[in-house]
């Protein structure tokens, strides 16, 4: 099936997950936006696909929300909290997840899709929606957005079409609501630019 896959462990190293700018950015975003997401969507069980070191999961836990994470590189565990390690499964997102359903109602994946080769894009999305969540938040790097192993940068319409074919519709009203929120000074440009909401 196409070219040989790149090695997740060699690409997403301990230094990648321990990189202060990267980890700090995610923590700031999670601390700021999770309370607002909880208020708007009232999730009961959150799945974070490509959860990295689990900063978002840590914040959801503070709101007494059940959490589950999937991460491809074992190097993410180096900076992961002990509590989060218990609920994160290592899995290559280019393969169909074999675990039983988690019965989640809210799924998210932030800046992961562009790291998945295009030939595996549908598998990645199926992993994201495997439990038929009510709501999906997704960001994916757009064309020309540079980053480590950005192998499938696409415009939003690409992901919208794929999600529609899987039964999920892009919701502009909910996206507008989220975009109306104030953003922390450290908020990266990709958060509002790449965000999509599906229901």
Residue spans for each PLM region:
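Short glycine-centered segments of the SAM/dcSAM-binding site in methyltransferase folds
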Residues: 134-137
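Conserved N-terminal segment of class I S-adenosyl-L-methionine
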Residues: 1-110, 119-131, 142-146, 150-158, ...
């Amino acid at each position: 099936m196409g070219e040989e896959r790149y090695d997740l462990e060699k690409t997403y190293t301990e230094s990648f997950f321990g990189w202060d700018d990267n980890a700090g950015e995610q923590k700031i975003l999670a601390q700021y936006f999770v309370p607002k997401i909880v208020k708007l969507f009232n999730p009961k069980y959150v799945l974070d696909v490509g959860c990295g070191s689990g900063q978002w999961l840590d914040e959801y836990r503070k709101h007494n929300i059940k959490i589950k994470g999937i991460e491809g590189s074992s190097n993410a565990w180096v900076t992961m909290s002990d509590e989060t390690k218990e609920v994160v499964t290592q899995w290559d997102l280019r393969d169909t997840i074999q675990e039983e359903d988690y019965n989640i109602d809210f799924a998210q994946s932030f800046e992961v899709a562009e790291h998945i080769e295009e030939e595996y894009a549908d598998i990645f999305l199926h992993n994201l929606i495997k439990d038929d969540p009510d709501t999906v938040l997704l960001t994916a790097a757009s064309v020309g957005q540079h980053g480590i192993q950005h192998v499938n940068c696409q415009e939003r319409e690409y992901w919208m079409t794929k999600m529609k074919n899987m039964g999920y519709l892009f919701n502009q009203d909910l996206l507008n609501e989220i975009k109306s929120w104030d953003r922390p000074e450290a908020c990266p440009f990709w958060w509002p630019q790449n965000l999509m909401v599906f229901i």
